[in-house]
Amino acid sequence: SFMESELLRMGKGEYDLSEMFIVRQKYLNQLEDNYYRGGNGNLGQGSLSHTWKNAFNQVGIVPEEVYHGINYNSEKHNHGEMVRYINALGNTAVKMKRRSPEYYKLINNLFDTYLGELPEKFTYKGKEYTPKSFAESLGLNMDDYIELTSVAHKPY
């Protein structure tokens, strides 16, 4: 990932950061956005670089060895089935025009089932962290990164 490369560039060493830790928060953010857009948000797979930055700032990060994000019988990530359930739950909340406490339990149970339970604390290289404290220990400031977009209808 880009941030792992940044850590190398900064002289922080090699890290294997958990992509799925960020993906879980990405889906939670998409569900919120979809609800506020009356069902017109994007609940699909994939994202943009600011999605990673936002999730990192919200919940932190963990090493891959702490959160693999595969909690089912597969060696590779396959979110097709999970995304169908995400869409079903997200669209049901929109149709009902409310999100009950049970809705949030269902969403978190869905992610726990497919991605695994989130660690509140973990030990990495002999030191105890929370996802937020681990993120802080990396020294990555998301405000140091900007996104650029090139479009065909504007000159370079």
Model region roles, listed by residue range:
Residues 3-156:
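Catalytic-core signature of thiol
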